A protein has these predicted regions:
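Acidic donor-binding loop of glycosyltransferase active sites
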Residues: 179-190
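Active-site and donor-binding regions of nucleotide-sugar-utilizing enzymes
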Residues: 1-109
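Short, well-ordered alpha-helical microsegments
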Residues: 35-38, 90-91, 135-139, 162-164, ...
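C-terminal alpha-helical cap of glycosyltransferases
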Residues: 248-268
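Catalytic binding pocket for nucleotide-activated donors in carbohydrate/polymer assembly enzymes
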Residues: 55, 78-79, 97-105, 164-170, ...
Length: 268
C-alpha cells in the first residue's frame, strides 16, 4: 500500500545513474544501514567509489537495523569505513558485530558542551509527545491527575503529528522546542529524541513506559535514566536528577581523520 519497494527501486536506479555520471572517488552520507543504503554501497563499490558512512544518530536499544547480521550479504553491503559521532556510537556498533577495522570516531558539530544548563525545580515539566498517538494518549491520561493536583506541565506535540487536548491552567500546550524553553524542572518523553536532547543538556529526564506497546528507547545502550509507567510517574518526576552524557555521545570533530578519509591522496 505504501509502494515502498517501487520507491527503493527508483532510488537505486537514480543512485546508479548519478554514480555513472559523476564518477566520485569517495561518497559519504548519514548512515543507518537501511535497505536503500545497502544497495547504494553495492552500486557504489561496482563503480569504484569508496564508501564512508557517518553514524549520526544514536545506536540505541532495539535498533537492530544497524546490525550487520541483518544484511543478506553480511559485510559486503557495509561501507568501507564508518565514522562515528562519538564513543557511544562506536561501542554500540562493535557490540552489534561490526568489524573494528572499519570503525573510527569522526566527532560531531551538532552539539557543544556549552549547551548544558541547569533545571529549575519550580518550573513546569516539559512533556515531549511521540509520533504514536496511542502512547501520547497514555501520557496525557497519566499527567492529567498530577496537573489537577497542582503540578504544572507544558506539552509539546511531535512536529509531524499534532496532538489535540484541552488546556487547563496547569496543563498547557507549547510550540516551543526544548532548547527554547527558558525554565524546565523535568523532561518527560517516550520514543522521541527529545529525551536524548534533554540528557545532553544535563536536564532531569524520565522515560514514560506505556502499557501494551513497545516504546523504543532512543538513548544509547549503556546509559540509564529513570523510567516510569502511569502508576509510578509522580514519584519518578519528583526524584529525577540531571545527568550529562554529551561528551560520550558526541566527540569533538576530528578534522584530521575527516581529511584523511575524504582526500586520501592529499595526505600521502
Amino acid at each position: 500500500a505504501t509502494a515502498q519497494a517501487a520507491a527503493l527501486r527508483w532510488q537505486a536506479h537514480c543512485a546508479e545513474r548519478w554514480l555513472a555520471a559523476c564518477r566520485p572517488a569517495v561518497v559519504v552520507w548519514p548512515w543507518e544501514n537501511h535497505a536503500w543504503e545497502r544497495q547504494f554501497v553495492r552500486i557504489a563499490r561496482q563503480s569504484g567509489a569508496r564508501t564512508i558512512g557517518y553514524q549520526h544518530a544514536t545506536v540505541a536499544q532495539r535498533e537492530w537495523n544497524y546490525s550487520p547480521k541483518t544484511n543478506s550479504d553480511g559485510e559486503k553491503s557495509l561501507p568501507d569505513l564508518i565514522l562515528c559521532s562519538g564513543a557511544a556510537g562506536k561501542d554500540g556498533l562493535l557490540a552489534l558485530g561490526h568489524p573494528a577495522d572499519r570503525i573510527r570516531i569522526g566527532g560531531a558539530l551538532r552539539w557543544k558542551n556549552n549547551c548544558v544548563r541547569s533545571s529549575d525545580p519550580t518550573a513546569p515539566v516539559y512533556v515531549a509527545l511521540p509520533a504514536d498517538h496511542l502512547i501520547a494518549d497514555e501520557m496525557i491520561v497519566a499527567i492529567r491527575p498530577l496537573a489537577e493536583a497542582g503540578q504544572t506541565f507544558v506539552v509539546k506535540s511531535h512536529p509531524m503529528y499534532p496532538y489535540d487536548f484541552t488546556d487547563t491552567p496547569t496543563l498547557q500546550r507549547t510550540d516551543a522546542n526544548l532548547a527554547d524553553v527558558e525554565a524546565i524542572s523535568v523532561v518527560l518523553y517516550a520514543a522521541t529524541t527529545v529525551g536524548l536532547e534533554a540528557l545532553l543538556q544535563g536536564l532531569p529526564v524520565v522515560r514514560f513506559i506505556p502499557q501494551g506497546r513497545v516504546s523504543v528507547d532512543v538513548v544509547p545502550t549503556g546509559f540509564k535514566q529513570p523510567a516510569a509507567d502511569a502508576a509510578n510517574l509522580s514519584r519518578a518526576l519528583d526524584s529525577a536528577e540531571p545527568t550529562n552524557i554529551s561528551d560520550q555521545v558526541f566527540a569533538e570533530p576530528d578534522l584530521e581523520t575527516w581529511q584523511k578519509v575524504l582526500f586520501p591522496s592529499s595526505t600521502n
